[in-house]
Amino acid sequence: YSRLGQEEGGQILVGGTSEDHPVDDVPSAGAFLQPTVIGGLSPTSKTATEEIFGPVVTLHPFNDEDEAVEMANITEYGLAGSVWSKDPERGHAFAKRLDTGIVWVNTWLNRDLRTPFGGVKQSGVGREGGAWSLNFFSELTNICVKGP
């Protein structure tokens, strides 16, 4: 995604390579991508809208909350998001407008395992966690037996 971000007109602001190897030279022991920040991309670019499972973030300036919500919801994915605000109530109100399965306000990856987790739109396959797991990981079977 570092290369794609650049191809789409973005600029690597921080990171973008593995610690000891160029991105194309992945050793057999694996490679670890530095935390990467990409700026200057369109909010509709592939790098900005795909679900990247790695330490990559794209930055997008906005004029008001409505524009920020529009940019956040433009993706076809919706696993998780985070909102950072000096005003927790405002952050909570903003979070309600996001199309994601879980939203953290002024925190990240903080979840009670008894609560549901899972994405919306093209993210995930439903809810897991707590009672939701019983339905998600169970398959009901109706067995009818006629006695002797």
What are these regions (language model features)?
Residues 1-2:
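Alpha-helical packing segments of well-folded alpha/beta enzyme cores
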Residues 12-15, 105-107:
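General beta-strand structural signal in soluble alpha/beta enzymes
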Residues 16-25:
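Short, solvent-exposed loop/turn elements at beta->coil junctions and helix N-caps
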Residues 25-148:
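Conserved C-terminal structural/oligomerization subdomain of aldehyde/semialdehyde dehydrogenase
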